[in-house]
Structure formats: C-alpha cells, structure tokens
Swiss-Prot record:
Catalytic activity: L-proline(in) + Na(+)(in) = L-proline(out) + Na(+)(out)
Keywords for this protein: Amino-acid transport, Cell membrane, Ion transport, Membrane, Sodium, Sodium transport, Symport, Transmembrane, Transmembrane helix, Transport
Transmembrane intervals: 16-36, 54-74, 85-105, 139-159, 175-195, 199-219, 246-266, 284-304, 327-347, 381-401, 407-427, 438-458, 467-487
Natural source organism: Staphylococcus epidermidis (strain ATCC 35984 / DSM 28319 / BCRC 17069 / CCUG 31568 / BM 3577 / RP62A)
Protein name from the UniProt record: Sodium/proline symporter
Taxonomy, superkingdom: Bacteria
Stretch forming the signal peptide: none
Main function: Catalyzes the sodium-dependent uptake of extracellular L-proline.
Subcellular compartments: Cell membrane
Taxonomic lineage from the root: Bacteria, Bacillati, Bacillota, Bacilli, Bacillales
Family classification: Belongs to the sodium:solute symporter (SSF) (TC 2.A.21) family.
A GO BP entry: proline transport
Molecular function as annotated in GO: L-proline transmembrane transporter activity; proline:sodium symporter activity; sodium ion binding
PROSITE patterns: NA_SOLUT_SYMP_3 (PS50283)
Record membrane topology: Multi-pass membrane protein
C-alpha cells in the first residue's frame, strides 16, 4: 500500500527538472508583471481596467482562467473521484450560466458602464445607474465585495498551500507564502493589464493540462474499457442520477445563477475594447470552458481506476490531479502540469485581489478623498490601489493560515454570496426601467443576508431535513429577486434621464 508521499517521492525528490519548470513559470509571471507596470498604470482606470483596451481573446481566456481557479484542476476532479458522474451537474449549470452571461450581461454591461459615468467598478456602476447621490448602494455593495472576496481569495491561497505540501513535501505555510509573494508582485505592480495577460497565458497552460492528463491516463490503463472497469467498481460511478437526489442536482445546477454577479468575471466584459468584439470572446471562452471541464471530469473518472489499480492511499481527493500528473509523466512534463495548477490558482487570486483593491480605492478611498479631486490625484489613487492589493492579500493569507474546509466549500460560499447579492441586481439594472435605489439596496442586502444565515444556521439542520441542505444561492437569489421587485414597485420611480440612459444602452447594443 502506497501513501501519497511514497507515490510521489520517486517522481520529485531527485528530479530537478520539476523545480526548473516551476521556476521558469514564476519568472514569466514576474516579467509580465513588469511589462504591465511599464505599459498601463498611469491612472486608476488603466491600473484597474486596462483602459478598456483589452482584445477579445485575452478577455475570453482571462475570464475563464479567473473563473475556474484551482477548483477546475483540484476541486472538481476530487469531487468526481469521490462521488462519481453525478458531480457533473455543477459543470452543466456553470457552462450554461457562462454562455447566457455572454449574451445577457456582457454587451449591455460594457456599454452601460461607459455611459453611466465611465464606471470602473460594479458598485460605481450601481451608484451611477441608480443616481444614488448619497452613495449608499456604492458603500454597501463595496462592503459585500470586500467581505466575500477576502473569503474567496483565501480559498486560492489554501489551494496553493495544499499544492506545495502535496507535491513537494513543503510545509503548507511555506507553500502558501510562495504563491502569495509571486501573485502579489505581478498584481501589485502590473495591475489589470498584467493580470489579464497572465490569465491568458495561464488559461492556455490549464487547457493543455486538462486535455493531457485524462488522455494519457486512459492509454496507461485499459483504454475505453477503463470506463467499464470504473462501473464495475461501483455502479454509481457512471450514473448521472444515482447517488444523488433531485435537490442535490438542483443545488449543483444552480451554480450557474451566480455568473451574472461575479465581479471578477464580469469586469472582463467592462474592459474589452468594444461590445462588438464579445461574440469572438464568447466562442473562445465557452469552448475553452467546455473542454477544460470535460478534462477535469475525465481526470476524476480515470483517477478512480488509476488510484485503485496502483493501490495508492489518496488521503485528500483534491490532490488527485497532482498524484496522477507526477506518476504518469516525465518530471519535466510533471513540472509543467504543476505549473498548470499554480496557473489556475494564481489567475483567480490576482483577479480577486484587483477587484477588491479597486473597490477599496474607487468605492471607499475616493469617496472619502472627494471625487472633485479625482482627476488631479491619479498617481495617489494608483498607489492606494496597490496598497489595497497588499492589505487584502495579508488578510486572506491570515485566514488561510489555518484551513478548515474544502476548496469546493470555500469557493461555494463566496460564489453564493455574490450570486445572491449581485446577480439579480445586475440583471434588473441592465433590463428593468422601474428599478429604484431602495429596491436595489433592499434586494442586494437581503440576498447577502440570506446566504450568510443559510450557511451559518439553516444548513446545519440538513441532518434533520435534507431540504435545508440545498445550495444557499437558491434561497438567496429568490429572496433578492422578490425583494428588489416589491420594494421597487412600492417606491418612487427613477428620474427620466435614468430611463433615457437605459434606452440609449439598448440602442447602442443593437447597432
């Protein structure tokens, strides 16, 4: 019987090639960070949004890489390995959600954020869209971003720590710090341009990795007959419905609802050169996502047979990709595949750090400093943005220092928080002329509160009744939709010019 350490020791301990690949990967990221620093950090819009000059292909892979994170390479394969094919309902929901997002949200958001005061953050857009002169919605939505993204970012650091602990035998905390130092460097100095370029680069690496590992695993095992072997081990392994419930399927499928309100994803739509380039971005982005998720499912399924055949004791299912990549491949290739995991983790961390930083700077600091001074203090705002990156990273690292949950659960909680608070509001903002400031604030707060209450007090009751175990985005999203609608209907309608802006957006998008 092998332990995880035994399975990896012969592959890594004496193979400097693996380390070389990781070091080369880190050097490339640092170079891109320096390039971003030289090219586009002169003002806050450039630092936070790339000056709205990003092309469709970088937009597509940047959105995909920052979306999928370590979850696609570590979380999803581990889930499929543990529960079988029934885990793929989440991938169906996510793919549909992402596809609809490109059609429903992307074009209007790109146009509307520019028309509505050239907003560079989601809270700033809400404020301008609803003519909130008191900045109440800007402050509340900014707080939601800071709280949930700190939680979300810490899940990425947990993934990085786990990677170095599992693959290299390093102390978890040492691995966490290595990832933190690199990602903070290129985000701190390079801003949005560096983050987008590194995301594109990392997205390519991730895709290659997710295609390579399951194909080589099949060749090493029993070809297509491997799936017959997997079914023989446990009938539920290849059954979409067995081993789960209707409520479980609905919960997994409902992850797709979160796409419309994820700031680190939809900010990509805000930064593209023109809304007319979004179809190109959509075709590449959805294709990348579909192939990557299929690969992750393939890793999980082939891993069932692979681990069993080699009598490996897999202590943590989320390390499945690491184990397979290091046993199946030459150390040089293994190093590349480990870099793919780092790519998945770091692309998301950098995006989340930047969005949180932009919220702290644009939605809080500039508010305190005084918007009338904004044009003459761009360097100051960029500096505050950089310091905010550092501050959020330190807080997230502190929380991640003592991990006590799985990557999937950590991501799930934050995803639900944004999905319930922002998804309905984004959709209402882009399509409904009767949305009011009071309705928006009430619905947003209600969605976030329901998610927090459900996670903290309702979900633990699932042992009594399975209904309480449903994914928290469902009740949060429903409550947010209803509260926003009801309160908007009961309060004063928006001014005419707000409605005129909405009509202008519709006209521009149709051109």
């Amino acid at each position: 019987m092998f332990t995880l350490g035994t399975a990896l020791s012969n592959q890594i301990d004496a193979n400097w090639q693996t380390y070389v690949m990781i070091i080369v990967y880190f050097i490339i990221l640092l170079i891109i960070g320096f390039y971003g620093y030289r090219q586009a950090t002169g003002n806050l819009s450039e630092f936070m949004l790339g000056g709205r000059s990003i092309g469709p292909y970088i937009t597509a892979l940047s959105a995909g890489a920052s979306d999928m994170s370590g979850w696609m390479i570590m979380g999803l394969p581990g889930s499929v390995y543990s529960t079988g094919l029934s885990a793929i309902w989440i991938t169906i929901g996510l793919t549909l959600g992402a596809y609809i997002n490109y059609f429903v949200v992307a074009p209007r958001l790109r146009v509307y954020t520019e028309i509505a005061g050239d907003a560079i953050t989601l809270p700033d857009f809400f404020k301008n869209r609803l003519d909130d002169k008191k900045n109440i919605i800007k402050i509340i939505s900014g707080l939601i971003i800071v709280v949930f993204f700190t939680l979300y970012t810490h899940s990425g650091f947990v993934s990085g720590g786990k990677l170095f602990e599992s693959a290299f035998g390093l102390n978890y905390h040492a691995g966490l710090l290595i990832v933190a130092i690199i990602v903070i460097f290129y985000t701190f100095f390079g801003g949005y341009l560096a983050v987008s370029i590194t995301d594109f680069f990392q997205g390519v690496i991730m895709l290659i990795a997710m295609v390579m590992v399951p194909i080589v695993a099949l060749l090493k095992l029993n070809g297509w007959d491997t799936f017959h072997d997997i079914a023989q081990m446990k009938p539920t392994n290849l059954d979409l419905f067995r081993g789960t419930t209707v409520l479980g399927i609905v919960s997994l499928f409902s992850w797709g609802l979160g796409y419309f309100g994820q700031p680190h994803i939809i900010v990509r739509f805000m930064s593209i050169k023109s809304h007319k380039l979004l179809p190109k971005a959509r075709r590449l982005g959805i294709s990348w996502m579909a192939v990557g998720l299929l690969g992750a499912i393939g890793v999980g399924l082939t891993g069932i047979s692979f681990i069993s055949e080699r009598h490996i004791k897999l202590e943590d299912p989320e390390t499945l990709f690491i184990v397979m990549s290091q046993i199946l491949f030459h150390p040089l290739v293994g190093g590349f595949l480990l870099a793919a995991i780092l790519a998945a983790i770091m692309s998301t961390i950098s995006s989340q750090l930047l969005v949180t930083s932009s919220s702290l700077t644009e939605d809080f600091y500039k508010l305190i400093r005084g918007s009338d001074k904004a044009s003459s203090h761009q360097k100051e705002f960029v500096l505050i943005g950089r310091l905010s990156v550092l501050l959020v990273a330190i807080v997230a690292i502190t929380i991640a220092w003592h991990p006590n949950d799985t990557i999937l659960n950590l991501v799930g909680n934050a995803w639900a928080g944004f999905g319930a608070a922002f998804s309905p509001l984004v959709l209402y903002s882009l399509y409904w002329k009767d949305l009011t400031r009071a309705g928006a604030i009430s619905g947003m707060v209600a969605g976030a509160v329901v998610v927090i209450v459900w996670i903290s007090w309702i979900k633990p009751l699932a042992t009594i009744n399975a209904f309480f175990g449903m994914y928290e985005i469902i009740p949060g999203f429903i409550v947010s939709v209803l509260i926003t609608y009801i309160v908007s209907k009961l309060t004063k309608k928006p001014d005419d010019y707000v409605i005129e802006n909405l009509n202008k957006v519709k006209h521009v998008v149709k051109e």
